[in-house]
Amino acid sequence: LLRTRYAEPAVRAAAETLIDRLGLGLAGLVNILNPDRIILGGLHRGLLAADPERLRAVVAERSLWGQSGSVPVLPCTLDHDSLVGAAELAWQPVLDDPLAALR
């Protein structure tokens, strides 16, 4: 839908809302984790491809790192969803209980 109908006002408005919210979430993660880069796959890669400047601007604008530069936001180069799923599965315990993962 993003690739074929992004020029339509309703599709574009919905995508921009999603991009802005994704950017806010990523900025929060940047502030907490201080990564050297962000790699987006799946649906998130599609949002990055739809409007990379907007997403990168939101992350830079809302993150502390944005004050001195910005963290690179890059598309995932893995085309196999199973590999991406395996990587997400490895992170699930951290997402479920972040404090326990630090112990």
Predicted regions and their residues:
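ATP-binding/phosphotransfer module of carbohydrate and carboxylate kinases, centering on a glycine-rich
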Residues: 1-103
